[in-house]
Amino acid sequence: MEEYETDIKQILGTVDRQTVSAKQVRQLLEERRKVDLSAHKKDLNALILKCFDETAAPSEKESLEKQAPARKTKGKRATENGTEEGKKPAKRTRKRKEDGEEGGKRKRNQDPANNPLNKPMKLSPKLAEFLGLEQLSRPQTVKKLWEYIKAHDLQDPNDKRTILCDDKLKSVFEVDTLHMFTMNKYLTNLMTKIPDDQLPKPQPKNEEPAAPNDLPKQEEKELVEPPTAESTA
């Protein structure tokens, strides 16, 4: 699984870390590598959490260290032995190289029109009532939930990844607490796929001015041939 570590860290650098789930990261990794990794779900989830911890911002790291002192001690010991410090430059070099090789592929993966996660889904009656909408994509749904969570200060002060549900959230999820990595698991039962033929059609892009090859035959001829005496008589 270690061969996917660089890809996972790059993916975590392009998503909203407060709303993304391990499942979403795994799906994006499968799209990037063009492989089916469902058989390695457990190992991949552990690697995703490891990469999430290693790339956390200082405020995130402080919270993570409170929850996992054993992991912190292990990392410190590796640094003192020189192992961790010796590996870091190689990882940065490899990351820069792969950035150049896979830059085009990453851009394609980020195209919203080609991302299945951005398709609208039908919300359950309770979720629709809570959000005031009947259809939303999964990322939009998670974003609105986090807007509500932050507006009402529902994050556990000891671990910002844990949400302390108020009465409204309890009525939707039917639990007292949620974890940021399990929120999408609950949403799976509250959102239904919409058949492709029932999805709203994308808005057409602004049409560009017609090129000379697109002009009518007579106009095109006038562009390349000067008028003759007969045509001007």
UniProtKB/Swiss-Prot annotation:
Q: Name one GO molecular function term.
A: RNA polymerase I general transcription initiation factor activity
**Region annotated Disordered, chain positions:** 55-122, 194-233
- Record-level GO cellular component terms: cytosol; nucleus; RNA polymerase I upstream activating factor complex
Where's it mainly located?
cytoplasm
Q: What keywords were assigned to this record?
A: Cytoplasm, Nucleus, Transcription, Transcription regulation
Tell me the GO BP annotations in alphabetical order. Answer: nucleolar large rRNA transcription by RNA polymerase I; transcription initiation at RNA polymerase I promoter
Residue pairs linked by disulfide bridges in the UniProt entry: none
Keyword Kinase appears in the UniProt entry = no
Q: Where is the DEK-C domain?
A: 1-53
InterPro entries (UniProt xref): DEK_C (IPR014876), SWIB_domain (IPR019835), SWIB_MDM2_dom_sf (IPR036885), SWIB_MDM2_domain (IPR003121)
SWIB/MDM2 domain location, by residue? 116-193
Q: What does this protein do?
A: Component of the UAF (upstream activation factor) complex which interacts with the upstream element of the RNA polymerase I promoter and forms a stable preinitiation complex. UAF seems to stimulate basal transcription to a fully activated level.
Protein name listed in UniProt: Upstream activation factor subunit spp27
Instruction: Provide the species name.
Output: Schizosaccharomyces pombe (strain 972 / ATCC 24843) (Fission yeast)
Gene name for this UniProt entry: spp27
